[in-house]
Amino acid sequence: MTFYLSGFRSFLKLWKSNPYFELGPATSSASFFLGVHCVIGNQQRWFSVKPTTPPNSKILNLLVTKARTLKKGNDSNKQASSGPHYFAAGEAKKRSHLSGNPQNQGHTLPVKSTVQLPTKPLNSEEWDKLKEDFKGKASFEDFVISQMTRSCSSVDVAKSLLAWVAAKNNGIVGYNLLVKYLYLCVFHKQTSEVIDVYEIMKAKYKSLESGGYTLLIRGLIHSDRWREALLLLEDIKKVMVPSKKNYGDCIQGALLHQDVNVAWSLYQELVGHNLIPLLETLKAFFDHGKDMNDDQYSNQLLDILLYLRNNQLYPGESFAHSIKTWFESIPGRQWKGQFTTIQKSGQCSSCGRAIESIHLSPEEYEFLKETIMRDVIDGGDQYKKTTPQELKRFERFVKSCPPFDIVIDGLNVAKMFPKGRESQNLLGIVSQLAQQNLQLLVLGRKHMLRPSSQWRKDEMEQVRKQAHCFFADNISEDDPFLLYATLNSGSHCKFITKDLLRDHKACLPDARAQRLFFKWQQGHQLAITKGFLKSKLTFQHILSYDTVVQTTGDTWHIPYDEDLVPRSSCEVPTKWLCLQRKTPAPC
């Protein structure tokens, strides 16, 4: 795609002008919203979570009442947790490294450029010489501008490239060159240059692709023409739902220019499309609200905190600081925040209050059980992992047994300790648990019953004497059986597997079911401590509290992600922000 500039204004005149070159705080290119070598296509989401209706005072009061019933009088117990739990942030990565299978082993080496990118603007002769030395098969201009975007080169250097291209092609510049130049202008916060490119595109095109819209929106929000970003958002709406980045940029532009009504209206549109807002968007609302004496705005910020709770979202460290700063700036309320941890007992190390229990209420348990049976076992993709006949056979087997205390993923557990024989590993675990008079269920595959170097017949016979056993076909997977047996045995039943059950959580239909599943999983999945074969069998401690935003009215407890501590989607933060109010809220 190309365009001619002669009908708009002289391209050479435009690019000879001295740029307004003010380097703002550099945004990491790795975290920037648009990949430098690609444009945004169809909107993609890992999962769709229907946002809860914005909470009102009644919902907040119910939450406060629930939290107050959990308060304990034992304020003297200040002993910290002696070790991380299985779902603590960063533990999955540690386990991966310990098992000799680290994630992301190595990194792809950067592609060697066949030309040395200039560090200062070049004239026509210098660009001619550089092109003569170019040995690549791709277009020289496309290759160089792509390398510039990857390196976040100076706007001046990129401008000299486009001026050279225009001079060689009678004022014609390819659309891709212009968009990548626009990327550099946005990255370096060159607002005047963004506006120049915007005027060119507006004159030549009735509509753009989504990547161009995204760049223009982010570039315009910092200028006095920020409302034109809202017009671009409307153009996107004509063909697709704007991305959460598009909405987030427009919200930040509205807040930057003091139009809070537009910002909140866009926020409601965003969640109304079942999009989860970027955390930086939510942070912008708290940053804007500092020292603001506006009850309506304050209530909307509290709604955001409850939105985090209902969707099990965790602010980053910077966002947590913004929340703390906002609370402490509320006039006349005297909120005080402290960054802290939660003890193994479930009490806050700062204020001593009890955090909500990890255990599901009877109503929550029945809801989750019915949902799992309907959407994961009966109506899910389990027949890709087993057969209807085998599932029926297992259901009859479970009904014939007493409720289990622990359900064991036999094959998974047997492979936890590579140095030991697999049947020996399994027998060691079963024997120690059987000594506690527990009702055990071992789930396995039929090949485990065939004698081999890894599966000794005498050891498997000992396993079958000490535990109920069910051996599925070799093509089957254990997870549906594990979930069925554990949930049917009651809330006391625990299970042992290294599998984090991400796929089954993803099968659940809504945010509530997914949150309850993860809460149940944290309270029921046992993780074996390494090296048990030479000592007594021990497990990592199970959390007694729920890692979720919560309030008692005069306190808030907000788990947050630490900087530089990686956390997978199946883990929870270990750091908390504790907020206490010294002055009661007005009636």
Curated annotation (Swiss-Prot):
Mg(2+) 2 binds at D479, D499. It is an enzyme of class 3 (hydrolase). Residues 342-578 form the PRORP domain. Residues 98-114 have a biased composition (Polar residues). Zn(2+) binds at C348, C351, H557, C578. It is found in: Mitochondrion. The keyword Transport does not apply. GO terms for cellular component: mitochondrial nucleoid; mitochondrial ribonuclease P complex; mitochondrion; nucleoplasm. GO terms for biological process: mitochondrial tRNA 5'-end processing; tRNA 5'-leader removal. Residues 94-114 are annotated as: Disordered. Binds 2 Mg(2+) or Mg(2+) ions per subunit. Degraded by LONP1 following mitochondrial unfolded protein response, probably leading to inhibit translation in mitochondrion. Mg(2+) 1 binds at D409, D478. Its EC number is 3.1.26.5. It catalyses: Endonucleolytic cleavage of RNA, removing 5'-extranucleotides from tRNA precursor. Keywords: Hydrolase, Magnesium, Manganese, Metal-binding, Mitochondrion, Nuclease, Transit peptide, tRNA processing, Zinc. Its main location: mitochondrion. Its cofactor is Mg(2+); Mn(2+). GO terms for molecular function: metal ion binding; ribonuclease P activity. InterPro entries: MRPP3_PIN_dom, PRORP_C, TPR-like_helical_dom_sf. Catalytic component of mitochondrial ribonuclease P, a complex composed of TRMT10C/MRPP1, HSD17B10/MRPP2 and PRORP/MRPP3. Catalytic ribonuclease component of mitochondrial ribonuclease P, a complex composed of TRMT10C/MRPP1, HSD17B10/MRPP2 and PRORP/MRPP3, which cleaves tRNA molecules in their 5'-ends. The presence of TRMT10C/MRPP1, HSD17B10/MRPP2 is required to catalyze tRNA molecules in their 5'-ends. Belongs to the PPR family. P subfamily. This is Mitochondrial ribonuclease P catalytic subunit. The gene is Prorp.
